[in-house]
């Protein structure tokens, strides 16, 4: 478990406060997990963003009438802190009986509080239900590897030694899988995800990638760190010209978390998958 997470509200019974309280947000420094991966804030080998989507966002108009919407939050991948997910939920619930005259006023409040917790500017979009409904759901790009016939029996820790490539052959391809699963390091609850790997480098053996991703199945870590581990393991193996790892997780507690890590500085669209 991350030592800071032990003091978070995650896994504990909590009072649900319905009036604005930004102090509910619980930041967790990224540095400890980065150290496990052998990187520091000064040597991060990726660009990226963590997209969070909130499906339980509500507040009051000055008339007392409630409004519901969907919140989209973009937290820079190099921010000093992640925000613990239950504290994020509790904070958002504290807006339920709080008055905001306009969406812009709410958005400014969210950006201020979340940026303070993350330690770097957080971008916020508050979208109407009609907007999100019109967007619909999308399919992941590239080739799905889930139908490959693989054998695996160890699910406790990620196993980068399972990965194989052909160092004599360079390819550019996009692969995806819906079989990513890990567990919350505090509660043990399952985190279900889909992941895209896009790269140009040594030709990756597709079956080895699938068994490697499945090896996360009982691993306990936060979403962001799982994606960073996948990124680094692939980077070390493939020596790629470019590499992107993008995971989209199923929501828990009204929030889904979608980490994106890439050699390039371009951020992807925040689009929903069928399980989201």
UniProtKB/Swiss-Prot annotation:
UniProt keyword annotations, A-Z: Cytoplasm, NADP, Oxidoreductase, Queuosine biosynthesis
Cited InterPro entries: GTP-CH-I_C/QueF, NADPH_dep_7-cyano-7-deazaG_red, QueF, QueF_N, QueF_type2
Catalytic residues of the enzyme: 184 (thioimide intermediate), 191 (proton donor)
CC terms in the record's Gene Ontology section: cytoplasm
Binding-site positions, NADPH: 85-86, 252-253
GO molecular function per UniProt: preQ1 synthase activity
Record EC number: 1.7.1.13
Subcellular location(s) per record: Cytoplasm
Binding site for substrate: 83-85, 223-224
Claim: Lipoprotein is one of the keywords in the record: no
Example GO biological process: tRNA modification
Pathway(s) served: tRNA modification; tRNA-queuosine biosynthesis
Entry annotated with the keyword Oxidoreductase: yes
Name of one Pfam family that matches: QueF
Catalytic reactions of this protein: 7-aminomethyl-7-carbaguanine + 2 NADP(+) = 7-cyano-7-deazaguanine + 2 NADPH + 3 H(+)
The protein's assembly and partners: Homodimer.
Family: Belongs to the GTP cyclohydrolase I family. QueF type 2 subfamily.
Function: Catalyzes the NADPH-dependent reduction of 7-cyano-7-deazaguanine (preQ0) to 7-aminomethyl-7-deazaguanine (preQ1).
Protein name per UniProt: NADPH-dependent 7-cyano-7-deazaguanine reductase
Species whose genome carries this gene: Pseudomonas putida (strain W619)
Gene this protein is translated from: queF
């Amino acid at each position: 478990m991350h030592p800071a997470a032990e003091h978070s509200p995650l896994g504990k019974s909590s009072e649900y406060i319905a009036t604005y309280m930004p102090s509910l947000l619980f930041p967790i420094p990224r540095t400890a997990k980065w150290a496990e991966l052998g990187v520091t804030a000064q040597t991060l080998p990726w660009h990226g963003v963590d997209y969070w989507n909130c499906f339980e966002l509500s507040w009051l108009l000055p008339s007392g009438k409630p409004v519901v919407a969907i919140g989209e939050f973009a937290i820079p991948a190099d921010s000093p802190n992640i925000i613990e997910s239950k504290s994020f939920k509790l904070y958002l619930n504290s807006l339920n009986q709080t008055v905001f005259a306009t969406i812009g006023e709410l958005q400014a409040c969210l950006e201020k509080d979340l940026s303070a917790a993350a330690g770097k500017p957080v971008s916020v979009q508050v979208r109407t239900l009609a907007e999100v409904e019109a967007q619909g759901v999308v399919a992941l790009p590239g080739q799905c590897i889930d139908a490959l016939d693989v054998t695996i029996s160890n699910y406790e820790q990620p196993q980068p030694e399972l990965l194989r490539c052909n160092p004599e052959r360079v390819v550019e391809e996009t692969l995806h899988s819906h079989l990513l699963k890990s567990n919350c390091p505090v509660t043990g609850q399952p985190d279900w995800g889909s992941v895209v790997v896009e790269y140009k480098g040594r030709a990756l053996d597709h079956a080895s990638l699938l068994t490697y991703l499945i090896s996360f199945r009982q691993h306990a870590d936060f979403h962001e760190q799982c994606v960073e581990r996948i990124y680094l393991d692939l980077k070390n193996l493939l020596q790629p010209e470019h590499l992107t790892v993008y995971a989209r997780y199923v929501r828990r507690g009204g929030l889904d978390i979608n980490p994106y890590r890439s050699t390039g500085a371009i951020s992807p669209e925040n689009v929903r998958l069928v399980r989201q």
